[in-house]
Amino acid sequence: MKALVTGFDPFGGDKVNPSLLAVGQLKKRIGEVVVHTAQLPTSYAHSAGVLRAAIEEVKPEIVLCVGQAGGRTELCLERVAINVQDARIRDNDGKQPIDKPVVKDGPAAHFATLPIKACVAEMRKAGLPAAVSNSAGTFVCNHIFYALMDIAQSHPIPMRGGFLHIPYVPEQAARLGGAPSMALDDIVRGIEIILEVSATRTSDVHTVEGRIS
């Protein structure tokens, strides 16, 4: 089984992006999964095209996109991507779309097709703070998550996909006055667990992961 795992380049003034650091440390094989990786630009205009090209080259059964969400305290598997671009800051092309769709006339939302609750349960068993998140935001992370699931719907090879938001790493938090962070090794282990679980499960567990807010 082949998996494609992507990370983003640094953005917003950061010198590193932990998603790219973590993806770069993944083993080439995790259990029965052959792992391929790709770097995506933090760009509304170009990220989906780079992702599509990587998918066409690799032809993966599993795609996991990973992105930084500074301020989060857990490894957050996203449940849903929405068809909205509403940028708080400019992307790396200097663009700041407001209230624009990811895909014109596309559905309002796409849901992850990885077993996100089962993955979260296994990460917690491994001692990693993890959660199902119900909002991927409206920046490039949500954009690429929506684009991924849109591609998956029409892809000739069956393909499941999802998005993982990760906290800062300690070197970033040290410059930001005590922002929450997570060790890079723990982030890498979380990604490995997601791939392991996704390779062995096609259905999710029926457990409560809802939140009031």
Show the residue positions of the predicted features.
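Hydrophobic, aromatic-enriched interface-forming segments
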Residues: 142-149
